[in-house]
């Protein structure tokens, strides 16, 4: 199927493919993130603070606080994909200075001129339909328009199931090296 995209009002990217649309992530649609990611602050907090949030049950509040801070200090940091009104995937990205967990990877640090593709998720029923590619392309377009020189991501070479790290093979298919 052919797709084409246009940027609409309020930073909404409309992708014409079976009524799929991508909308900028905001506090208003934060609850549309998939459950594993909505209740995870693995990237957003350092490991100790993430465990503390998990133990206290404040994960959703911490996720909202992180998103609010990024939106206020830096601007748009993700997109949510929908088919009709149903959320089917998302992508998150931010400057590495706003992603505490990024510093804990052996291949850190992220280049100073790069933005970190934090994570992406596509509902299993949508795998192979181009949703993930559309999300990453929307992120890349947004970042290019903002003058970003590079996008970096951490990948999992042993990926077996959805997790906070994207499969390295998938990132490679999208052009990451």
Indicate where each model-derived feature is located.
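Aromatic- and Gly/Pro-rich amphipathic surface segment
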Residues: 36-74
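Ligand-binding pocket scaffold of soluble enzyme catalytic domains
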Residues: 33-35, 79, 90-92, 120, ...
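Conserved N-terminal entry element of GNAT/NAT acetyltransferase domains
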Residues: 1, 6-52
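Conserved acyl-donor/pantetheine-binding loop and adjacent beta-alpha core of acyl/acetyltransferases
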Residues: 57, 69-76, 82, 87-119, ...
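Conserved GNAT acetyl-CoA-binding A-motif
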Residues: 136, 143-162
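Conserved acetyl-CoA-binding loop of GNAT-fold acetyltransferases
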Residues: 167-177
């Amino acid at each position: 199927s052919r797709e084409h995209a246009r940027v609409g009002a309020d930073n909404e990217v409309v992708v014409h493919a079976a009524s799929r649309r991508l909308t900028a992530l905001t506090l208003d649609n934060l609850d549309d993130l998939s459950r594993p990611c909505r209740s995870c602050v693995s990237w957003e907090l350092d490991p100790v603070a993430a465990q503390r949030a998990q133990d206290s049950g404040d994960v959703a509040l911490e996720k909202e606080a992180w998103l609010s801070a990024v939106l206020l200090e830096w601007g748009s940091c993700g997109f949510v994909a929908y088919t009709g009104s149903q959320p089917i995937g998302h992508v998150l990205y931010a400057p590495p200075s706003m992603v505490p967990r990024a510093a804990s990877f052996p291949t850190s640090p992220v280049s100073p001129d790069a933005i970190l593709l934090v994570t992406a998720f596509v509902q299993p029923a949508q795998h192979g339909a181009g949703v993930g590619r559309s999300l990453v392309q929307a992120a890349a377009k947004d970042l290019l328009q903002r003058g970003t020189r590079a996008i970096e991501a951490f990948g999992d070479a042993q990926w077996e199931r959805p997790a906070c790290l994207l499969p390295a093979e998938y990132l490679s298919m999208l052009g990451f090296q």
